[in-house]
Amino acid sequence: MESLAALYKNHIVTLQERTRDALARFKLDALLIHSGELINVFLDDHPYPFKVNPQFKAWVPVTQVPNCWLLVDGVNKPKLWFYLPVDYWHNVEPLPTSFWTEEVEVIALPKADGIGSQLPAARGNIGYIGPVPERALQLDIAASNINPKGVIDYLHYYRAYKTDYELACMREAQKTAVNGHRAAEEAFRSGMSEFDINLAYLTATGHRDTDVPYSNIVALNEHASVLHYTKLDHRAPSEMRSFLLDAGAEYNGYAADLTRTWAANNDTDYAQLIKDVNDEQLALIATMKAGVSYVDYHIQFHQRIAKLLRKHQIVTDISEEAMVENNLTGPFMPHGIGHQLGLQVHDVAGFMQDDTGTHLAAPSKYPYLRCTRVLQPRMVLTIEPGIYFIESLLAPWREGQFSKHFNWQKIEALKPFGGIRIEDNVVIHENGVENMTRDLKLA
C-alpha cells in the first residue's frame, strides 16, 4: 500500500481542486478555516471538551488544538497557523512534524488573537469557515462571506467522495473500533456492568470518553430498546439477557461507527433473531452497487424485516408485502438503514443531490432516514438494520384493524431483550462493495 504521506499528498491535490472550483464559482480569493475555540461552561472557568471544525480537519489531522487557522486558495501551499502559546497551566502541543507537514506551510501562532497581523491586509474577498462568526468580523471579514452557504454546500457535497487517504484513515479507525468491540464482548461475557464494559472498550481502543466520535451506546437487556442509550448503569443486572454495543473510534479525525448485539444464551429465539438480522444485513450489503438510490436499500430492508417478523411469528396471518405497505415493520425498525460516514459520524450532505445543495428529503413514511443520495464510487456508508421492541411505538398498534396480526405474547417475551442492531461500514467501489468491518473478521 502507498504510504500515508503519498496518499495525503494526493488528498491535498483533490482538496485544492475543490477549493479552486468553489472560489471561482463564488468569486472569492481564499478561504480562512478556523479550528475553533474553547468555550467555557456557563458561569465557570473551565471549558467544554474541544471539538474541532470538521472542515478544518479535512485538511490537516489536527483535532485537539483550538485557535488554529488555515488559509487556502487552491493554488499556493496551504498555510497553517498552529496555536503555540507559552503556557505553564495547560498542555501545549508542539509544532507538528509528521507525514503531512511537507504539504502544508506550518507557522507558529503564539497568541490566539495574533492571527490578524498574519493575514493579508485585503480581506474583503476572503471567506471564513468556522464556529465563531464574531471572530471573523473582528478580522474584517465581510458578514456575507462568513460561512457562505453556497461554498459550504459545495464542499459538503464533495465530502461524500472519499480520497484514498481518507479511506486509509477510515480503515485504521475500523481496526481500533473492532478491538474495542472484542474487549466489550469479553467484558459482557464476564458479567460486567455497562459502566465497566465501557471502560473496557475505551481501554482497548486507547480513547478517552471525549475522543470517541460519539457517545458509546452500551446497553444491557431492555436498555437495547433505547436507540441512543448513553446512561451507563454502574451495577450489572441480576440476569444478563442481551448486550447491544454501538461504539466507534477515530483515526486522524475520521470515524468508525460499528454496532453488534449479543445474546447471553445462544439457545433462545432472541439469539436466532440476532443471527437472522445479521444474515439479512450481509445479504443486503452483497446487493449494493453504484447507481442505486440509498432509499431503495432502506425500503428493501423493510421487506427483509417483514420476512423475519413472519419467520419468528412476531407478526402473523398477513403477507410480507402488506406488512411493508401498511408499515407494520415501522415500529420494529424506526430508524434509517444508515448514513454517510467520514469526518463526522452522521456525515454531511446526505440529502444533497448536487453541488448547489438541492435537497431531497427522506420519504414521509421513513422520516428518520439520513441519506437520499444515489450511491457512487468512493462513498462510505453505514448499514445498520435493527429490530426493537419499543412499547411507545407498539402501543398504537394494540388497537385497530392490524392489532390481530401482532403476536403480543411473543412480543412481551422479547421485550426484556430490548432490541437488535447490526452495523457495518461499507465503501462503494466501481465494481462492488467493500465491507471494512467484516474484512477485519468482526462476526
Curated annotation (Swiss-Prot):
InterPro entries: Creatin/AminoP/Spt16_N, Creatinase/aminopeptidase-like, PepQ_N, Pept_M24, Peptidase_M24B_aminopep-P_CS, X-Pro_dipept-like, X_Pro_dipept. It comes from the Bacteria. The keyword RNA-binding does not apply. It is an enzyme of class 3 (hydrolase). Mn(2+) 2 binds at D246, D257, E423. GO terms for molecular function: aminopeptidase activity; metal ion binding; metalloexopeptidase activity; phosphoric triester hydrolase activity; proline dipeptidase activity. Mn(2+) 1 binds at D257, H339, E384, E423. The keyword Manganese applies. Its EC number is 3.4.13.9. Keywords: Dipeptidase, Hydrolase, Manganese, Metal-binding, Metalloprotease, Protease. Binds 2 manganese ions per subunit. GO terms for biological process: proteolysis. It catalyses: Xaa-L-Pro dipeptide + H2O = an L-alpha-amino acid + L-proline. HAMAP family: X_Pro_dipeptid. PANTHER family: XAA-PRO AMINOPEPTIDASE 3, XAA-PRO DIPEPTIDASE. This is Xaa-Pro dipeptidase. It comes from Citrobacter koseri (strain ATCC BAA-895 / CDC 4225-83 / SGSC4696). The gene is pepQ.
